[in-house]
Amino acid sequence: MAVRQALGRGLQLGRALLLRFAPKPGPLFGWGKPGPAAAWGRGERPGQVVSPGAQPRPVGLPLPDRYRFFRQSVAGLAARIQRQFMVRARGGAGPCGRAVFLAFGLGLGLIEEKQAEGRRAASACQEIQAIFTQKTKRVSDPLDTRCWQGFRLEDYLIGQAIGKGCNAAVYEATMPTLPQHLEKAKHLGLIGKGPDVVLKGADGEQAPGTPTFPFAIKMMWNISAGSSSEAILSKMSQELVPASRVALAGEYGAVTYRRSRDGPKQLAPHPNIIRVFRAFTSSVPLLPGALADYPDMLPPHYYPEGLGHGRTLFLVMKNYPCTLRQYLEEQTPSSRLATMMTLQLLEGVDHLVQQGIAHRDLKSDNILVEWDSDGCPWLVISDFGCCLADQHVGLRLPFNSSSVERGGNGSLMAPEVSTAHSGPSAVIDYSKADTWAVGAIAYEIFGLANPFYGQGSAHLESRSYQEAQLPEMPESVPPEARRLVRSLLQREASKRPSARLAANVLHLSLWGEHLLALKNLKLDKMIAWLLQQSAATLLADRLREKSCVETKLQMLFLANLECEALCQAALLLSSWRAAP
């Protein structure tokens, strides 16, 4: 009994000593009471500004709040307290002092065990991340077996126009496998004609031997760059940000393209971002519909009043069935499907942020759609002509003059961008601008009108809207998705969740219900759930020749897995569910 009382008294005294001599930490968010979502995400803290060239802080498991003062060496802290205690005692520690340090040693053992558990969890997350990172980097390239082909416009058969935008026209195209196929296509008169007008068989199906069009060729409109390849590449370099290394291996007239230190960044591949397979300059051809659709953009030898130059840039990409706007005009996805579509956009934006690139022109017209074998849509972000991909400024653009370009889409321009004022030390931070645009596009995905489009009283402007003016989403939308969309559209960027945190929230709401149902989120339970998800995802990926949308999303989640970020998302979800 005496020993028990001594140990109990020692624990009380040890705790009092720790509270007295340990450094007082600032407000931190971890396993304690959930803080605001501001700056939550990949290694961020509320109010923290990350410099453009800074490496991301290694993220480990945060200790519970009651252990935060053990950030310095445990051994060093123990020695410091012991020295101060011995100085005060001036004669050595008696039985009471020995009990204090015995209790203190027991406490250190518990904390070291907690730290070891956190290290094991962080290590498990890193191993899972390494496995799936390699898998998600694989982006199919239909031209990978033709490394030295496809760098001339003459290598392609051009079909019908797919669409046109503010600065380019897009046509379907194919590359004949063998030279005799090219001759056959020319003989049948298929050059310049799409599948709607090709020869049909007796049963109404497409005739054998008729080419299909797996590629889309984007022909840029060259009004101000001149006709030299150097000037064209310099003026339109942002279009080359999502280009692969092989895509830029061709000759550009008399010029070989070389990425310069002052040029834009090269974007690493991602399943939710367009990939440019080939890029080259060539003479402007008179393509189908050109005189009717964009005569003013043609060279004068095609149209006397045309403003275009005789040479321009061509980009070869995958041909997708439709844009997101076209898809939503025909179909209204279910709430679960709409959640997964929003999640895909967040995954793409998070990848851009990690690479230090801002798209700045996100809208449903610039998002392409294809379907998996189950009919679920897969979204791809395209059109990087307005992107910010500067190697020197990162996501913080110096705004020292009103002539500095803010971006391309004024309607979906984040408040911190649209309200920025130029000045000698002014800077526009784009780190959460694309995330805000995803929140606005989410209204369209869930079947509602985009509140930042249109006219009348329902129309909002990013410069002046208040969060209370945002339209309420219907009850059919999952509550987590409703809360997240409103959170993405907060005016203050510091209160807005990062794309990574938002993506983790949707991942957990879709597939982590078992984890969220736990009263206390324990590390061993979380790691067991992650291992189970990893095994199931690997098995699903191996069993199917082409992964479905859900499997792809789970692979992306595991490829970006970080223990602390996952805990933050779980805490945010728990706080939303606990709120009235």
Curated annotation (Swiss-Prot):
<dbReference type="GO" id="GO:0002020">
    <property type="term" value="F:protease binding"/>
</dbReference>
<keyword id="KW-0808">Transferase</keyword>
<dbReference type="GO" id="GO:1903298">
    <property type="term" value="P:negative regulation of hypoxia-induced intrinsic apoptotic signaling pathway"/>
</dbReference>
<dbReference type="GO" id="GO:0050432">
    <property type="term" value="P:catecholamine secretion"/>
</dbReference>
<keyword id="KW-0418">Kinase</keyword>
<keyword id="KW-0072">Autophagy</keyword>
<dbReference type="GO" id="GO:0031396">
    <property type="term" value="P:regulation of protein ubiquitination"/>
</dbReference>
<dbReference type="GO" id="GO:1905091">
    <property type="term" value="P:positive regulation of type 2 mitophagy"/>
</dbReference>
<dbReference type="GO" id="GO:0004674">
    <property type="term" value="F:protein serine/threonine kinase activity"/>
</dbReference>
<dbReference type="GO" id="GO:0005634">
    <property type="term" value="C:nucleus"/>
</dbReference>
<dbReference type="GO" id="GO:0014046">
    <property type="term" value="P:dopamine secretion"/>
</dbReference>
<dbReference type="GO" id="GO:0016301">
    <property type="term" value="F:kinase activity"/>
</dbReference>
<dbReference type="GO" id="GO:0005829">
    <property type="term" value="C:cytosol"/>
</dbReference>
<feature type="binding site">
    <location>
        <begin position="162"/>
        <end position="170"/>
    </location>
    <ligand>
        <name>ATP</name>
    </ligand>
</feature>
<dbReference type="GO" id="GO:0051881">
    <property type="term" value="P:regulation of mitochondrial membrane potential"/>
</dbReference>
<dbReference type="GO" id="GO:0044877">
    <property type="term" value="F:protein-containing complex binding"/>
</dbReference>
<dbReference type="GO" id="GO:0031625">
    <property type="term" value="F:ubiquitin protein ligase binding"/>
</dbReference>
<dbReference type="GO" id="GO:0005739">
    <property type="term" value="C:mitochondrion"/>
</dbReference>
<keyword id="KW-0472">Membrane</keyword>
<dbReference type="GO" id="GO:0000423">
    <property type="term" value="P:mitophagy"/>
</dbReference>
<dbReference type="GO" id="GO:0043123">
    <property type="term" value="P:positive regulation of canonical NF-kappaB signal transduction"/>
</dbReference>
<dbReference type="GO" id="GO:1903214">
    <property type="term" value="P:regulation of protein targeting to mitochondrion"/>
</dbReference>
<feature type="active site" description="Proton acceptor">
    <location>
        <position position="361"/>
    </location>
</feature>
<keyword id="KW-0723">Serine/threonine-protein kinase</keyword>
<dbReference type="GO" id="GO:0051649">
    <property type="term" value="P:establishment of localization in cell"/>
</dbReference>
<keyword id="KW-1000">Mitochondrion outer membrane</keyword>
<dbReference type="GO" id="GO:0034599">
    <property type="term" value="P:cellular response to oxidative stress"/>
</dbReference>
<dbReference type="GO" id="GO:1903384">
    <property type="term" value="P:negative regulation of hydrogen peroxide-induced neuron intrinsic apoptotic signaling pathway"/>
</dbReference>
<dbReference type="GO" id="GO:0097449">
    <property type="term" value="C:astrocyte projection"/>
</dbReference>
<dbReference type="GO" id="GO:0097237">
    <property type="term" value="P:cellular response to toxic substance"/>
</dbReference>
<dbReference type="GO" id="GO:0006468">
    <property type="term" value="P:protein phosphorylation"/>
</dbReference>
<dbReference type="GO" id="GO:0051897">
    <property type="term" value="P:positive regulation of phosphatidylinositol 3-kinase/protein kinase B signal transduction"/>
</dbReference>
<dbReference type="InterPro" id="IPR000719">
    <property type="entry name" value="Prot_kinase_dom"/>
</dbReference>
<dbReference type="GO" id="GO:0099074">
    <property type="term" value="P:mitochondrion to lysosome vesicle-mediated transport"/>
</dbReference>
<feature type="region of interest" description="Required for outer membrane localization">
    <location>
        <begin position="111"/>
        <end position="117"/>
    </location>
</feature>
<feature type="transmembrane region" description="Helical">
    <location>
        <begin position="94"/>
        <end position="110"/>
    </location>
</feature>
<dbReference type="GO" id="GO:0002931">
    <property type="term" value="P:response to ischemia"/>
</dbReference>
<dbReference type="InterPro" id="IPR008271">
    <property type="entry name" value="Ser/Thr_kinase_AS"/>
</dbReference>
<dbReference type="GO" id="GO:0000422">
    <property type="term" value="P:autophagy of mitochondrion"/>
</dbReference>
<dbReference type="GO" id="GO:0071456">
    <property type="term" value="P:cellular response to hypoxia"/>
</dbReference>
<keyword id="KW-0547">Nucleotide-binding</keyword>
<keyword id="KW-0963">Cytoplasm</keyword>
